[in-house]
Curated annotation (Swiss-Prot):
Signal peptide: none annotated. One of its GO terms (molecular function) is actin binding. The keyword Hydrolase does not apply. The keyword Disulfide bond does not apply. Keywords: Actin capping, Actin-binding. GO terms for biological process: barbed-end actin filament capping. GO terms for cellular component: F-actin capping protein complex. Belongs to the F-actin-capping protein alpha subunit family. This is F-actin-capping protein subunit alpha. Pfam families: F-actin_cap_A.
């Protein structure tokens, strides 16, 4: 048995194994913490080549998954890095300003911008709907997510010149509050796909919400809550569609946040008590009656400025 253990200890991981393990750590870093993970990985690996290759492969995926916001040079605004705005590996469209941001994924900065060309922008007909929806979503986000950013992209049918064809818009809402000095970080991400169906005159709306929080003061507690939604409304004018869609998004997101608050308010009397020992190994009883003070959802709401 000892010989087997010695053999395992002496087994050297291959280059690819090291890279895949490093990528796993990169991709599973909580919101806003990938650079802390990168610093530790670099020290642990002691192999610049493995580290660089893992980082080059993992950072773009992480940035798009977390929909990070980067400031564009010269005060041109901010761009959300996402798969919906991706033109190529390092270029991302900001439809609001009709600019393309060139991104350094590993450094997480926007190095420069260029004007978007006609092929990268939607037609005037599609832009009318995109612009109206973008304005309504901006208004909603400014009211509900003081730390939030939003974008509306056309992902299907962007070249349609008028009624008669289907097209699809995607609403992206992302909010992040980083407070590492207080040992806590939080994020909110929501993606809403709106399929404009011309023949049936119906808008099919599908949403995905994800809330994350990480607390690491004298411990490690992480929240990762997800929820899918489906709804619909009628195909109307651009302005009327925008108002209807924004109201649907507002309704579902507000209800979801309320449901999280209710679910976590029940933790002291249900889930926590079912998990606990009769008497912990510390021989000290945990104050179950006061566990609401550790409410994750309340802290996420506070950190992101939700509900204000």
């Amino acid at each position: 048995m000892a010989d087997e253990e010695d053999e395992l200890l002496e087994t050297e991981l291959s280059y690819d194994q090291k890279k895949e393990i490093a990528k796993w750590f990169f991709l599973n870093a909580p919101a806003g913490e990938i650079n802390y993970v990168a610093k530790d990985l670099k020290a642990v690996l002691s192999d610049e080549e493995v580290y660089n290759e893992a980082a080059m492969e993992a950072f773009p995926v992480y940035n798009k998954t977390h929909m990070i916001c980067l400031e564009m040079p010269s005060g041109a605004g901010d761009v959300i890095v996402s798969s919906y705005s991706e033109i190529n590996e390092n270029e991302y469209l900001d439809p609001r300003t009709a600019q393309v941001a060139i991104v350094d994924h590993v450094k997480q900065i926007c190095t420069k911008v260029r004007p978007a060309n006609d092929e990268e922008l939607p037609s005037l007909y599609i832009e009318e709907y995109r612009y109206a929806l973008d304005a309504e979503i901006q208004r909603y986000v400014s009211e509900s997510y003081p730390k939030g950013m939003s974008a509306v992209n056309c992902v299907k049918g962007k070249d349609n010149e008028g009624p008669g064809s289907d097209f699809e818009l995607v609403v992206i809402i992302t909010a992040m509050r980083l407070s590492p000095q207080n040992f806590c970080n939080g994020s909110w991400r929501s993606v809403w796909n709106i399929d404009f169906q011309d023949e049936s005159q119906v808008l099919d709306i599908k949403g995905k919400l994800q809330v994350g929080a990480h607390y690491f003061e004298e411990g490690n507690v992480e929240l990762d809550a997800k929820k899918d939604f489906q709804d619909s409304t009628i195909f109307q004018s651009a302005d009327d569609c925008a108002i209807a869609i924004a109201n649907i998004i507002r309704h579902h997101e507000t209800e979801y946040l309320a449901s999280l608050e209710v679910a976590y308010s029940k933790l002291p009397d249900n889930t926590f008590k079912d998990l606990r020992r009769k008497l912990p190994v510390t021989r000290t009883l945990f104050p179950w009656q006061n566990t609401l003070q550790f409410s994750l959802t309340r802290e996420v709401e506070k950190e992101l400025g939700l509900g204000k």
